[in-house]
UniProtKB/Swiss-Prot annotation:
Gene Ontology CC terms: helical viral capsid; ribonucleoprotein complex; viral nucleocapsid
Keyword check for Ribosomal protein: no
Main location: virion
Annotated stretches, region: Disordered: 1-26
GO function term, MF aspect, one: RNA binding
Location of the protein in the cell: Virion
Protein name: Nucleoprotein
Species this protein is from: Quaranfil virus (isolate QrfV/Tick/Afghanistan/EG_T_377/1968)
Function noted in UniProt: Encapsidates the negative strand viral RNA, protecting it from nucleases. The encapsidated genomic RNA is termed the ribonucleoprotein (RNP) and serves as template for transcription and replication.
This protein's record includes keyword Thylakoid: no
Disulphide-bridged cysteine pairs: none
Alphabetic keyword roster: Capsid protein, Helical capsid protein, Ribonucleoprotein, RNA-binding, Viral nucleoprotein, Virion
Length: 527
């Protein structure tokens, strides 16, 4: 199998779409990543796709069919790429890291076993793949000019693998540190931060590696943002979590001052503030940017076309219309479904029905979404809970022997963009989830559970009289009470209409439909 050489890097005439503020607009009419042109984003995607291809084919010694169909092969290939990327990134910043020590030690290779297959990685070969693919488009000696942009997009390619681990184990604690012996991990339970047990599934991303959390700070769940800011020191890294808090809770009165107070105080001072913020979030949702993640091996193939001579050609036009949150992601999912009809997937899971549900949750982050919404938008009527997947997570482990079993991804009937703003126009209990995290922004009928009603009972009205603990708690308590008073046992949410998935093409969206699916009060993590 050959891959066509990268297109010429000579300047070509391009069209740049802008909004009224002169900012470039990406697919779906959204503002493009700051400082990054559409041409540059396409170049980065191409470079990463080439890396995945060469790691799978040249280093792992796997086939093009493995690249397309074996979800786990792609995840492990992306793991190596993410590691070597952070190795070069740390070197460029004159820093030290555990991955740097691993790459720079005396051995030339390292090995791991994936479902009965021993894979040997040559470090210099891995470095070479990364450097060759990057320098197709970027000047290696000007790493500061491109590393930040590459880092963000690279993290989005790596998101699928990180989320697959999260779907296995719901976060319940914040990792404070890993001791030098690498055997002791210091953690603090979320309840130590004032987070109700029934809302720990809002901690999406909490167990991601620090480099992933930092790269995608504005896509982390609200609990993750709160605990990271609670522990943050007032340094260059804390700013990311301040910004993430301001975005996620931008609908909260005086959030700028609240963020400033939280940064300056220790976790023990912030417990009631955190609890009130999450109680409010249970009703209103939060504004972090939700993301759709694709299996990296399959995505590398989806960005190419295969000709009659078995040669892959990068499809620049398709890549330019691709994104991780809007119509571009659903367009790619439609293409994904067509490719998988001829090339069914494998995840080392025998039961195809369970495999396709795990894939869907990992791609769309729907392990925190209400089953009523999922039943309405897909061809699946019987969604399973985490307790139904014990055997499947055993066979998913890399150390487990190979398990035969192919499956096809879940078909969609309707779609809407994933949430990046409040999903409502209106501004407790035990460890079972008290409400869902809204992933899709399509219209819905929400239910208010008794557990949700009980949140914040320890304690938009008043202004903030002073920047102190008591004043902030009073403000949030009164704001929560005003929100509770505005809601009954159910309310209408959603900011856009659902669209027909079968009408979606690369050039137009599906037709809008008048529907408002109702929640049923159950999610993947429910008891």
């Amino acid at each position: 199998m050959e891959v066509d050489p990268a297109p010429s890097t000579a300047p070509k005439p391009t069209r740049k779409r802008v909004n009224n503020s002169g900012e470039e607009i990406g697919s779906g009419g959204k503002r493009a990543l700051t400082g990054l042109s559409l041409t540059q984003k396409v170049a980065i995607h191409h470079a990463i796709a080439l890396m995945v291809y060469h790691v799978v084919i040249d280093i792992f010694k796997c086939t093009i069919i493995d690249l397309i169909t074996d979800v786990n092969i792609g995840v492990y290939a992306m793991n190596q790429i993410w590691s070597i990327h952070n190795y070069f990134r740390t070197k460029n910043n004159s820093g030290r890291s555990s991955i740097g020590a691993k790459i720079d030690n005396a051995t030339d290779t390292y090995q791991f076993i994936l479902h009965g297959r021993t894979i040997t990685v040559n470090k210099e070969e891995l470095k070479g793949v990364y450097k060759r693919c990057i320098t197709t488009y970027f000047d290696w000696d000007k790493m500061n000019d491109w590393m930040g942009s590459v880092h963000t997009i690279m993290a989005l390619w790596n998101l699928f693998g990180s989320r697959l681990s999260e779907v296995r184990i719901m976060p319940s604690a914040n990792t404070i540190s890993v001791e030098k012996d690498n055997r002791t991990t210091v953690v603090k339970d979320f309840n130590q931060y004032g987070i109700p047990a029934g809302m720990r599934h809002f901690a999406t991303g909490a167990d991601f590696k620090p480099t992933m959390k930092s790269a995608l700070a504005q896509s982390m769940g609200p609990v993750t943002v709160l605990v990271q800011l609670s522990e943050a020191k007032d340094n260059q890294y804390a700013g990311k979590w301040v910004d993430a808090l301001k975005r996620a809770f931008s609908h909260i009165p005086h959030i700028d001052q609240i963020a400033k107070f939280m940064l300056a105080n220790k976790p023990a001072v912030l417990t009631k503030i955190n609890g009130y913020l999450m109680a409010i979030a249970g009703y209103t949702g939060t504004r972090e940017q939700k993301r759709i993640a694709f299996p990296p091996g399959t995505l590398a193939y989806l960005l190419h076309d295969l000709d009659k001579e078995n040669k892959l050609h990068f499809n620049e036009d398709r890549c330019s219309k691709f994104d991780f949150s809007g119509a571009g992601a659903f367009r790619m999912y439609s293409h994904f479904l067509k490719v998988c009809k001829k090339n069914p997937l494998r995840m080392n899971i025998a039961d195809p029905g369970k495999a396709r549900q795990l894939l869907f949750h990992t791609m769309f982050g729907t392990h925190v979404e209400d089953f009523g919404i999922l039943q309405s938008m897909t061809d699946v009527s019987d969604w399973l809970k985490r307790k139904d997947f014990e055997e499947e997570f055993k066979t998913l482990r890399a150390s487990h022997a190979r398990v035969e079993g192919n499956f096809y991804p879940i078909e969609m009937r309707y779609y809407s963009k994933v949430c990046s703003s409040l999903n409502t126009k209106m501004i407790g209990g035990g460890s079972a989830p008290v409400t869902n995290c809204q992933i899709f922004s399509g219209n819905r009928k929400r239910i208010v559970t008794e557990g949700l009603k009980s949140l914040g009972q320890q304690g938009v009205g008043a202004g903030l009289s002073a920047l102190d603990k008591d004043s902030i708690e009073k403000l949030l308590r009164e704001h929560l009470e005003s929100i509770k008073a505005a809601f009954g046992d159910s309310f209408e949410a959603g900011t856009v209409k659902w669209r027909k998935f079968d009408g979606l093409t690369w050039d137009k969206e599906g037709d809008e439909v008048e529907m408002r699916p109702g929640e049923v009060g159950e999610i993947y993590w429910s008891n």
